[in-house]
Amino acid sequence: RQAARVCSTRFQPENWNIDPIQRRNNCYNYATNIQTNTFAQPGRASGRRYRENVGGEVYSACLRDGLTGLRAPDAGTECLIALVVWPGEDYHFYRLDNNGYWSHKSGRTEARNTDDSGDPIIDPRTADRGPYSDFVGWLGVGPRARVN
């Protein structure tokens, strides 16, 4: 498990797994812990979404939304999230919770703290992510982050 630092979200699926919140918020909302009920898309808050569903495009769109780019899984005082992509198809985010494990919410499904094999997520780089084969990188979520 990774040590969660100053900003750590608690895994509280009851805040996300109720309608209409569950069906109107996706993995980007969940990872950033910002409920918009708009099914947020990277770059939409900044007015410039990603053009293609490839790692660099989605990552850059997140930076435009005010997230912090990180080279290592250490967000300091910000909340730590991870971006993965299913090349050409979809993106997905995971977030580090205050218990040192990771959790996520796929699209309109329930928030959960297990991977596609049903195992606790210790590290999103090595978890069973299904078709999301490309680990793109780490991002920090701080007060500048805006999603929509």
From Swiss-Prot:
Please give the residue ranges the record annotates as the region Disordered: 105-128
Look up the signal peptide feature and give its range.
Answer: none
Isomerase as a keyword of this entry, yes or no, is no
Q: Which domain of life is it from?
A: Eukaryota
Q: Which UniProt keywords apply?
A: Secreted
Q: Where in the cell is it found?
A: Secreted
Q: In which tissues is it expressed?
A: Component of the acid-insoluble organic matrix of the calcified shell.
GO CC annotation terms, alphabetical: extracellular region
The protein's name in its UniProt record:
Insoluble matrix shell protein 1
Q: Which organism is it from?
A: Ruditapes philippinarum
